[in-house]
Amino acid sequence: MNQTKCIFYSAILMIFCAPAVHSQNLTDIYCGHLLNTETGNWLRNALIKVDQGSGRVKELASYTTVSKDNSGSSLDLSDQFCLPGLIDMHTHISEDVSGDLIEFYTISQEEQLKIGRVNARITLMAGFTTVRDVGVYIAWTDKKLRDEIDAKMTPGPRMKVAGYYLTIPGGGGEVAVPGYEGEVPDHIRAGVARGADAFREKAKRVIEGGADHIKLIASGAVLAYGSLPGSPEMTQEEIAAVVEEAQKTGIRVTAHAHGALSIKQAILAGVKSIEHASLIDDEGIELARINGVSLTMDVYNGDYINEMGLLDGMPEEFLEKNRETTEIQRANFRKAHQAGVKIVFGTDAGVYPHGQNAKQFSYMTKHGMTKLEAIQAATVRAAEVLGMSQEIGQVEEGFFADIITVSNNPLIDIKSLEDIQYVIKEGYLYKDRNKQ
């Protein structure tokens, strides 16, 4: 067992030996400072009234004094900087950090779910109240976890899930380990296809199965054997077939695409969201801009792999591909941002430890964004890409009462978002700095 995994399972023991997550249903939340994520302005002395039945904000007002009742339904955050709950647009919550892909051949879905439940709680405690989970190797694990969270059986962020990857045989979305001669479970290959008609059928099945969006693997991957990040895997015709099927039901499609050609093919095929975009060229940037395509660029992830990859058991092939893509991705992040392309916050958490998601904010500001733009990427801009711009990403009347707090102004100290003090999701208090 590698060092990171030892740390991870130690964390599991600590979590399950600790008291249950604190959950308190609130009606009145008193925020000393509340960030308007559209304007960047702070609202002083904001009183947020919550409808307990729906978990949504029913009134946003102001206060002069904090009124406390004996029911425990009010919360004094007058010394805090309050923001809407954060959104991570690229997670793998049911997976942990490991370079040993053979594990996916033998682990059961229930075992994978146990890992996911721990990671869901960790992610929520880090201030992320919504995530777009973009693929699992064991089909539908993400859906089961989503449904448990929605039923309040498991504490975690609101999840929008893909069900499984759509990928070519041996592609970046399939577990393919050189020299492995054992049995490959069917649930590992649920989305494997070749040809436009076959991919159209796979898209139909994943939609009917309950996916919130579709994740397809357009190019090679960094963390896959024999897969080259710059090389196309799916054809433009195959991608277009998936998009056409998804459009029938309004399902959104996002494409894993490192390579410049795959990025352009995905955009021309109608995909509206690109993951990684490491090797995007000027033509791809312009195509993304004029077509309103968002980029999810995980600009922190490369440093973690460089520093911890060997300890996590990652083979040299993976580490070398990571070295080849890390800095060019960051340069292209800056270019795309300067060109006016919408960039949303997404970390690839699962490749590095869950709960460290907020480390990416400082990388986004280092490579060209203002602090407000980085926060917007994880709130209002991400909500737009999810199709939830009237529900999350802001604290406004009618929106879900998802609120997090920090002790310092994140527009001055962006790293304060790495130390969340309170977490409220749908009016329920899940994290209280005084009751850890």
Positions of PLM-derived features:
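Metal-associated gating/positioning segment near the N- to mid-region
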Residues: 80-147, 151, 169-170, 237, ...
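His/Asp/Glu-enriched, well-ordered alpha-helical/loop segment
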Residues: 106, 248, 317, 324-409
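Divalent metal-dependent hydrolysis catalytic cores, especially in the metallo-beta-lactamase
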Residues: 116-140, 155-165, 211-222, 252, ...
